[in-house]
């Protein structure tokens, strides 16, 4: 928790998030084991402690998301899943897959969340340089069931996910059922119950690869070189080496941590959250950064009349 707090120090200590300025992590100090460290040095220190605790990268990326993934030496914090002992449910997979795709696995689906155009571009989808993690994280193209048989739509045509047809609103378009690359990442548990939401794969919240990318980022922000940590993550999937610039680190976090719930926080930390991209327009006055935080609910302000609504709302 300390390393995650410190990597976001400039956000947490920013009293005015609408002035386009952030505190400098080099000037934010912590006492760590009797030593005064700045925010970035603190991140590096705690990430190194994970290595001392014998956390490491799994040789195979997908091992972290397999059925019965408890033995992973990379996963640090997970939500335990067990059909007998717990009632936790994984909603993401259920929401993303097409109805017939999920049905072919004996599950159910909502035909929902898909990869954005920006995500496809970051992964290099469809190019010779496509990142190896795309096929692990996303379903795209023709779909097959667990026995290898083709999956069809209700009209008898083959179910083909079309990643580039994704848009904010595809209602009443020819691609209403098939637009977008869908969430994959977790190995399909054929014994899952509750329409596939109660599975044996533990839900991964934080793992060592994330810590390595945090360390790389902290080193760069502190004026050092973070190439080793960035390329340690990339070499695991045999991706080409890259220099550890902030732009490349943010890109790598999207590649490595897809569907793991960090993107919004990352974009805020890198000052990219309020920009327009692809078909997502910038909201009125969003250049001020006001959407970095949520509005205070009106019922809370009624309970405490001294609270002033956050700027922009």
Feature locations, PLM:
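Extended, well-ordered alpha-helical segments in internal regulatory regions
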Residues: 8-23, 210-224
């Amino acid at each position: 928790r300390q390393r995650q707090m410190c990597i976001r120090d400039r956000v947490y200590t920013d009293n005015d998030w609408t002035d386009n300025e952030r505190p400098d992590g080099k000037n934010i100090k912590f006492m760590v084991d009797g030593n005064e460290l700045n925010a970035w040095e603190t991140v590096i220190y705690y990430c190194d402690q994970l290595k001392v605790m014998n956390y490491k990268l799994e040789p195979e990326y997908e091992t972290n998301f397999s059925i019965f993934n408890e033995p992973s030496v990379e996963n640090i914090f997970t939500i335990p899943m067990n059909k007998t002992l717990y009632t936790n449910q994984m909603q993401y997979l259920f929401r993303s897959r097409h109805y017939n795709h999920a049905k072919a696995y004996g599950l159910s689906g909502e035909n929902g969340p898909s990869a954005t155009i920006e995500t496809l571009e970051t992964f290099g989808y469809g190019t010779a340089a496509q990142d190896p993690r795309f096929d692990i994280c996303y379903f795209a193209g023709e779909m097959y069931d667990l026995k290898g048989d083709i999956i069809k739509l209700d009209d008898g045509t083959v179910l083909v996910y079309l990643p580039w047809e994704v848009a904010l609103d595809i209602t009443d378009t020819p691609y209403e059922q098939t637009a977008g690359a869908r969430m994959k990442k977790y190995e399909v548990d054929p014994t899952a119950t509750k329409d596939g939401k109660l599975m044996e794969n533990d839900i991964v919240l934080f793992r060592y690869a994330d810590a390595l990318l945090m360390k790389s980022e902290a080193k760069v922000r502190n004026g050092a070189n973070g190439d080793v940590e960035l390329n340690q993550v990339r070499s695991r999937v045999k991706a080409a080496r890259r220099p550890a610039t902030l732009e490349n680190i943010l890109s790598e976090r999207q590649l490595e941590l897809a569907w793991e719930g960090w993107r919004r926080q990352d974009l805020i930390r890198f000052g990219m959250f309020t920009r327009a991209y692809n078909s997502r327009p910038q909201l009125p006055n969003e250049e001020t950064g006001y959407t970095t935080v949520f509005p205070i609910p009106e019922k809370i302000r009624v309970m405490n009349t001294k609270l002033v609504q956050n700027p922009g709302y």
